[in-house]
Amino acid sequence: MSNRTLRVNELIQRELSEILRKRYQSEATAITITELRVAPDLRDARVFVSIVGSAEEQDEKLRWLRAHAGELRYEVGRRIVLKYLPKFEYVLDHSPEKSARILQVLDEIDRQTPPRPEAEND
């Protein structure tokens, strides 16, 4: 990935997060943009979002994001000057849930493992 693409990823992610936080406070509660990947030609961007809540609530928030994709893109375009502003595709990011599950399994293993006897110091 080029340095320019990385900078565009970070810039759009930051601006989009800011727009959701300030302009759409009630609608965007529990939504976090975890990653943004812009295509090399800068025409398309995949926006990975983490949504806190039940599967039903996640689906509802994801539908809201997809329904307002054009409006959100317009708002980002007002803040960022690029030759091409990518179209946003919103994708649910399951990595926070997977991470939480891994931590839970590690905690269970920790509890089941007997403590090691401490070495005697002479």
Swiss-Prot record:
One of its GO terms (cellular component) is cytosol. It is found in: Cytoplasm. InterPro entries: KH_dom-like_a/b, RbfA, RbfA_dom_sf. Transmembrane segments: none annotated. Keywords: Cytoplasm, Ribosome biogenesis. Its main location: cytoplasm. One of its GO terms (molecular function) is ribosomal small subunit binding. Signal peptide: none annotated. One of its GO terms (biological process) is maturation of SSU-rRNA. The keyword Cell wall biogenesis/degradation does not apply. One of several proteins that assist in the late maturation steps of the functional core of the 30S ribosomal subunit. Associates with free 30S ribosomal subunits (but not with 30S subunits that are part of 70S ribosomes or polysomes). Required for efficient processing of 16S rRNA. May interact with the 5'-terminal helix region of 16S rRNA. Belongs to the RbfA family. HAMAP family: RbfA (MF_00003). Monomer. Binds 30S ribosomal subunits, but not 50S ribosomal subunits or 70S ribosomes. This is Ribosome-binding factor A.
